C-alpha cells in the first residue's frame, strides 16, 4: 500500500521553520514548518525542473500519532527523482479532513511558490481522500494550477459518500441484528461510535463468519471480496462517525431511500433501520464537501484493481459528474494498475502526472 490510508480560513500565519538537515549537494533540499496548525514539508531536488507538485495525502484516523518533523509521503522520492519539487501538508486536523485540507494546501502553495521563486508549472496530486482534495481544489481554485491527478481517489461529493457509507452500515445491521460484541442499536448508533476500531472490527468479523452465505451476498452488493468485507464495513463506520462529529450530526438520512440489490428488496426496505439527517450537518457536506464535475484544469484519474476502499460504483461517479457539467474534455481516466488500495509504484505516479501535462 503506497501512501498512507489516512488520508482555518484566515490569512496564512507562517511559523519559523528550519531545514531538516544540512544535506550534501547531491541530496534534495528539505525544509519544514507549520502553517496555522498544519505541519508541512517542502523537498526540492538538485536538478529541479521548475515544476511544483502539491501532494495531498489520504485519510488519517483521528488520534494517529503525528511525528515531527513531518515525514515524506511514500511517493515523494519518485517525484523528486523525476525532477519535481514536492510540497505536502499534514493538515490541521485528522479524519475526513477534506475541507481543512483544501485550505491548508492553498496556504502551503502560496508559501512554497514564494520560497521557490521561479515556479514554471504547479500541479496538485492526491491519493485516496487526497484525491477529493485535489479535485475540489481544481474546481474552486483553478487559477493557481496547471492541472492535477487523483490516484485511488474518493472522488465523490461528500453527501454521496456519506450516503454510501450509511448504506453499508444499515445493511449490516439488517442482516446481522444484535451481533455479539456490537451495540444492539446498530452501527449507526452513538454506542458504535464509542467503540475502538479493533473492537468494532472484531465484532463485525465474528458476525460475518456466523453467516457466511449472507456475508457473501453482502460482499457482492458492496463490490468487495468476502475477505475484505470486515475491514470495509469497519472503515465505513469509522469515517461516517468521524464525519458526523465534524459536521455536527448525521449528515445524511435514509427515510425515503429505496434500496436495491440486497436479495429480497421488499423485506429489506421494510425492515432496514431508518435515520433522519441533521440539517446543520447536511448543509456541511453539501457545501464544504461538494464536487460538481465542473473541473477547470486538466485532470487525470487512475484507480487500482480490486480496491476494497474505492470500489467500481465510486469510481464511476466523477466522470458522470464531469459529463453532466460539460467538462469531459479536461478529464482523462487512465486504465487501472496495481492491486488493492493505492497500489502504485513510483513510475506509475510519475506517468500519471505526465499524463496531466499531455495534450488532451
Predicted ranges, named:
Residues 121-176:
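Primarily recognizes the serine-hydrolase "nucleophile elbow" in alpha/beta-hydrolase
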Residues 154-290:
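Accessory cap/linker subdomain of secreted extracellular hydrolases
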Residues 331-344:
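Histidine-bearing beta->alpha loop at or near hydrolase active sites
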Residues 50-59:
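Short beta-strand element of the alpha/beta-hydrolase
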Residues 301-303:
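Short beta-strand/loop motif that positions the catalytic acidic residue
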Residues 23-48:
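N-terminal cap/lid segment of alpha/beta-hydrolase-fold proteins
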Amino acid at each position: 500500500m503506497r501512501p498512507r490510508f489516512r488520508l482555518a480560513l484566515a490569512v496564512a500565519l507562517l511559523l519559523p521553520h528550519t531545514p531538516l538537515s544540512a544535506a550534501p549537494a547531491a541530496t534534495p533540499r528539505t525544509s519544514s514548518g507549520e502553517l496555522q496548525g498544519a505541519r508541512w514539508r517542502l523537498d526540492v531536488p538538485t536538478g529541479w525542473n521548475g515544476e511544483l507538485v502539491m501532494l495531498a495525502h489520504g485519510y488519517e484516523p483521528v488520534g494517529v500519532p503525528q511525528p515531527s518533523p513531518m515525514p515524506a509521503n511514500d511517493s515523494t522520492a519518485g517525484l523528486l527523482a523525476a525532477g519535481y519539487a514536492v510540497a505536502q501538508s499534514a493538515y490541521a486536523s485528522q479524519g475526513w479532513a477534506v475541507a481543512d485540507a483544501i485550505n491548508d494546501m492553498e496556504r502551503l502553495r502560496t508559501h512554497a511558490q514564494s520560497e521557490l521563486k521561479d515556479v514554471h508549472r504547479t500541479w496538485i496530486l492526491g491519493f485516496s481522500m487526497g484525491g477529493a482534495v485535489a479535485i475540489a481544489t481544481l474546481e474552486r481554485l483553478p487559477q493557481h494550477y496547471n492541472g492535477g491527478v487523483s490516484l485511488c481517489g474518493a472522488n465523490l461529493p461528500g453527501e454521496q459518500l456519506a450516503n454510501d457509507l450509511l448504506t453499508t452500515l444499515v445493511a449490516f445491521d439488517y442482516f446481522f441484528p444484535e451481533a455479539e460484541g456490537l451495540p444492539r442499536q446498530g452501527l449507526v448508533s452513538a454506542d458504535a461510535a464509542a467503540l475502538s476500531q479493533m473492537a468494532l472490527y472484531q465484532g463485525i468479523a465474528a458476525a460475518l463468519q456466523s453467516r457466511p452465505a449472507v456475508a457473501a451476498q453482502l460482499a457482492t452488493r458492496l463490490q468487495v471480496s468476502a475477505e475484505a468485507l470486515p475491514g470495509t464495513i469497519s472503515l465505513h463506520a469509522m469515517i461516517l462517525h468521524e464525519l458526523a462529529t465534524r459536521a455536527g450530526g448525521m449528515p445524511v438520512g435514509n427515510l425515503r431511500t429505496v434500496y436495491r440489490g440486497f436479495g429480497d428488496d421488499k423485506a429489506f426496505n421494510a425492515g432496514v433501520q431508518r435515520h433522519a439527517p441533521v440539517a446543520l450537518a447536511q448543509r456541511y457536506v453539501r457545501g464544504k464537501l461538494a464536487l460538481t464535475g465542473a473541473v477547470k484544469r486538466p485532470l487525470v484519474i487512475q484507480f487500482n484493481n480490486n480496491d476494497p476502499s474505492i470500489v467500481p460504483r465510486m469510481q464511476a461517479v466523477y466522470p458522470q459528474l464531469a459529463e453532466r457539467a460539460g467538462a469531459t474534455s479536461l478529464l482523462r481516466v487512465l486504465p487501472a494498475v496495481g492491486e488493492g488500495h493505492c497500489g502504485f509504484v513510483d513510475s506509475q505516479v510519475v506517468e500519471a502526472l505526465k499524463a496531466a501535462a499531455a495534450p488532451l
